[in-house]
């Protein structure tokens, strides 16, 4: 497996042969300019590192077998990023990345090292989406597909964690946060029957009793 490193100041377009056996590492290290994926091609690569500059994702599916790191600009192009590795994959970098669709297809989990947002859909095919102490932003129209007691958003279980923040439009809404800790799945459902203005709800499960607990057995 080799690496393709994009430098310079102009715009560049790169096409990956879908029949290629080896998946490369893509590194974007540009002072100015954008690296664009072929819009009609589904990519399968080992890793994507945006150290500097911009990367335009394919409008189809970007399959990643290793890590994603963004310290520049990632333009999702309404495409899907599928994490399909066999060891834990990370989403890191210094930029807060906005994804359109994410397919969590890694039994060893996907782990957040930086805050990120999902605009359209988070699909659980395999494994958990581990946010650690980071924040996951979900947009007004974001949906979550195929979550379960073994496939869910996992927080660090501490009150210092930032949790999951979901935006809601004015009006009614019904949404389930498929969230929990490493030890327990504790989904939360909100049925909003009246909402006069747009807003957001933040959920962070905590392992342990609430400090105001008055029942000795912590059964409430």
Feature-to-residue mapping (PLM):
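Extracellular beta-sheet-rich ligand-binding/adhesion modules
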Residues: 1-220
């Amino acid at each position: 497996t080799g690496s393709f490193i994009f430098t310079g100041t102009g715009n560049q377009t790169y096409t990956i042969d879908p029949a290629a056996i080896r998946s490369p590492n893509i590194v974007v290290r540009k002072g100015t300019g954008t690296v664009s994926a072929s819009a009609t091609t589904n990519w399968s690569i080992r890793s994507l590192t945006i150290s500097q500059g911009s990367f335009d994702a394919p409008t189809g599916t970007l399959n990643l077998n290793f890590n994603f790191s963004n310290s520049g600009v990632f333009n999702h192009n309404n495409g899907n990023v599928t994490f399909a590795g066999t060891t834990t994959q990370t989403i890191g970098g210094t930029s807060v990345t906005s994804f359109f669709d994410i397919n969590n297809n890694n039994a060893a989990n996907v782990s957040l090292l930086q805050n990120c947002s999902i605009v359209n859909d988070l699909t659980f095919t395999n494994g958990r989406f581990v946010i650690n102490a980071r924040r996951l932003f979900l947009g007004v129209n974001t949906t979550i597909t195929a979550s379960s007691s073994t496939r869910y958003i996992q927080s660090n279980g501490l009150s210092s964690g930032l949790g999951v923040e979901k935006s809601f439009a004015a009006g009614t809404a019904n949404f389930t946060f498929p969230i929990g800790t490493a030890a327990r799945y504790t989904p939360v459902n909100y049925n909003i029957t009246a909402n006069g203005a747009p807003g957001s709800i933040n959920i962070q499960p905590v392992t342990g009793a609430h400090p105001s607990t008055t029942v000795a057995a912590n059964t409430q």
